[in-house]
Amino acid sequence: IEVLLGSDDGGLAFVPGNFSISAGEKITFKNNAGFPHNVVFDEDEIPAGVDASKISMPEEDLLNAPGETYSVTLSEKGTYSFYCSPHQGAGMVGKVTVN
């Protein structure tokens, strides 16, 4: 599945912001705007035993240009919350359910 970072109208959002995938399916996060974005999984809101640092981008790493991507494969079933660290305060958060 492809998830856009930034809506077409320039909004600070993940599109889609709430979605489901099958275990082992790849998620590709793609910068859709000229703003720097990243993808960080919330260590308190992912399945037990999953290491957030192994599935997140480093906090200082940003997708700066439109079209830049970050891909991750989630194999543990459960619900994962994620956010863009520069824009978390603006509500740029999302959730994926792995079935």
Swiss-Prot record:
Give the encoding gene's name. Answer: PETE
Entry similarity comment: Belongs to the plastocyanin family.
Q: Which GO terms describe its cellular component?
A: chloroplast thylakoid lumen; chloroplast thylakoid membrane
The residues the entry assigns to the signal sequence are none
| CC cofactor | Cu(2+)
Q: How does it sit in the membrane?
A: Peripheral membrane protein
Q: Where is the Plastocyanin-like domain?
A: 1-99
Name the species this protein comes from. Answer: Solanum crispum
Keyword annotations of the record: Chloroplast, Copper, Electron transport, Membrane, Metal-binding, Plastid, Thylakoid, Transport
Q: Where does Cu cation bind?
A: H37, C84, H87, M92
Q: Tell me which InterPro entries the record gives.
A: BlueCu_1, BlueCu_1_BS, Copper_blue_Plastocyanin, Cupredoxin, Plastocyanin
Any GO MF annotation of the entry: copper ion binding
List membrane-spanning regions: none
Q: What does this protein do?
A: Participates in electron transfer between P700 and the cytochrome b6-f complex in photosystem I.
Any idea what this protein is called? Plastocyanin
Which residue spans adopt a coiled-coil conformation according to this UniProt entry? none
**For this UniProt entry, what is the primary localization, expressed as one broad class?**
plastid
**UniProt-annotated location(s):** Plastid, Chloroplast thylakoid membrane
Q: Name one Pfam family in it.
A: Copper-bind
Q: What is the lineage of its organism?
A: Eukaryota, Viridiplantae, Streptophyta, Embryophyta, Tracheophyta
Against PANTHER family, the record matches this protein to: PLASTOCYANIN MAJOR ISOFORM, CHLOROPLASTIC-RELATED
